[in-house]
Amino acid sequence: MVTALLTGCTGASPDSPIQKDTSMNVEQSHQDVLDIFAAVRSVVGQDGWGDEDPGWNLCGSDGEDAAQYTYASTRRLPLPGTADQVAEGVTRALAAIGYEGARVQHDTELTPERTVISYPKGYLGGTAADGFAIFFQAFDSYADVAIDGHCVPGRAPRFGEPLNPRPTDLP
C-alpha cells in the first residue's frame, strides 16, 4: 500500500471540503474510522477483505495526549461493477455519512491504472490539518482502503485494551 503513503501531511486549504466536527473523543474517532470502512464495504462488498492493518498513532505535540486511529484493508475479489462505478458508489456512501465532496480521480502512471479517491484534498493532495484522510483505489478484482482518523485529544488505548486488542484477544 505504498500509494497511501504518498498522500503527504499538508495543512488544510481554504477550499477543503471537510464537513466533520473534529472535536470528538478517542472512542468517537475510532468509531468514525469503522463507520467509513463500513460505508466502503457497503459498496465494494462485505466479504473478502484481508491484509487488515489497524493501529493507533500518537499525534499530540508539546507533551499533550492525542491519538489517531488508522485502518487499512484490501479486497482481491471481482468488483460489483467497473472501477469507476464502484468508486462513484463509494463517494455517495461517504457523502451519506457526512463526508461530502470526495471525487473520483485516475492514476494513469501506475500499472495497472487505478481509479482513486483521496479525501479531503484529492489524489496526492495531502491530509486535513489534523491528519485525517481517506484513500481508496480500485481496479480489476482489487480494492483497498486506508483511513487515517482524526487526531483527537486523549490517550491512545494501550495494547490489550478494548479499542486496541491483542491479536489473541480477537474473536
Task: Describe the role of every protein-language-model region.
Residues 15, 65-66, 157:
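Secreted/processed peptides and extracellular or luminal domains of membrane proteins
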Residues 10-14:
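Bacterial signal peptide processing site
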Residues 21-32, 78-82, 86:
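Extracytoplasmic/periplasmic, Sec-exported soluble proteins
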Residues 1-2:
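Sec-dependent N-terminal signal peptides
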Residues 27-71:
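Compositionally biased P/S/T/G-rich terminal and signal peptide-adjacent segments
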Residues 27-43, 125-171:
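Extracellularly exposed regions in secreted/surface proteins, prominently low-complexity, repeat-rich
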Residues 67-120:
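Long, charged/polar, surface-exposed segments that mediate recognition or autoinhibition
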Residues 5-8:
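C-terminal motif of bacterial Sec signal peptides marking the signal peptidase cleavage site
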